[in-house]
Amino acid sequence: MSWNHNRRWKDFQALVNAEDYFAFFELPYDPRVVNVNRLHILRKFAQYLAPLEHFQGSEEERLEQARQALEKAYQTFLTSTPQQEKLFRVFQDYGCPDPVGGCAGCSSLGERGECSPGIPA
């Protein structure tokens, strides 16, 4: 590991916000990316962390796995969007048929609030 070896799992578990996680693991990040995608990065991070719940390696190895999970979650949102990742129900149930272009071209809402493409005149 290239970061501080004095970190402990219990210290990691006490962290509460994205910036704290990046500081803890000494990972560089663009604050603009984190500000826009904060909840999505943390949700993706939690998904990647789930398998570590039963991790049998050392504390240092576990922390390295967590560090890699955060880096992977962050990297995801450098090349993808929340709409593409569909981590939250709003993007799963009520997705726009055009996730790249957004809903600007939509003219009506379907029964469940789905975005419906505009009908040509």
From Swiss-Prot:
InterPro entries for the chain: NifW (IPR004893)
Example GO biological process: nitrogen fixation
UniProt entry keywords in alphabetical sequence: Nitrogen fixation
Pfam hit, one: NifW
Quaternary structure and interacting proteins, as annotated: Homotrimer; associates with NifD.
Homology family: Belongs to the NifW family.
Functional note: May protect the nitrogenase Fe-Mo protein from oxidative damage.
Stated name of the protein: Nitrogenase-stabilizing/protective protein NifW
